[in-house]
Swiss-Prot record:
Organism from which the protein derives: Parvibaculum lavamentivorans (strain DS-1 / DSM 13023 / NCIMB 13966)
Subunit structure: Homodimer.
SUPFAM superfamilies: PRTase-like
Disulfide bridges in this chain: none
Gene: pyrE
Pfam families from the UniProt entry: Pribosyltran
GO BP terms: 'de novo' UMP biosynthetic process; pyrimidine nucleobase biosynthetic process
MF-aspect GO terms: magnesium ion binding; orotate phosphoribosyltransferase activity
Protein name (database record): Orotate phosphoribosyltransferase
Amino acid sequence: MDQEKVLKEFEKAGALLRGHFILSSGLHSPVFLQKALVFMNPQRTGRLCKALAEKIRQEVKGPIDAIVSPAVGGIIPGYETARYMKVPAMYVEREQGEFVLRRGFPLTKGMRVVMVEDIVTTGLSSRECIEAIGKTGAKVVAAACLIDRSGGKAKVGTKLISLARIAIPAYAPDKLPKELAALPAEKPGSRHIA
């Protein structure tokens, strides 16, 4: 699946939103990718994650023992990608502000893992997830996401495989363009939800 088809899936789902958004990273953007609208359709999610699984297989040499994703946003694409790769799907979740592996997931030393995310902006959640995986002794052989909205600038600490790599502007709160600052800000992301 090429980049244009990936973005078309988001457009068909009504998931390519325009306005003024505060992203989970704290940055502000005129575009928000509301992946929940994509993930509510199992067929659409399946198409995207099957394509991601195929791309991971092409780019990662050697066996893959598991897919691990950060909660909340990475759980669905991680699970679906793992299903197509026929490996276990696990996730890390926040406990006292840090990602940890819980629920008895059997991630152990020496396992070869791909970390799967939904959307990457700054790479912070990916880096935190990879750090949590590393604490188990497992080896992260790659990271993957549906869309890298940093245009390839995000650093996650390992190779980042994406179905689409686009540069969507994101601004620090004190560096907003006038036209964006004039719009009311919405915060549709999932980080810090109480």
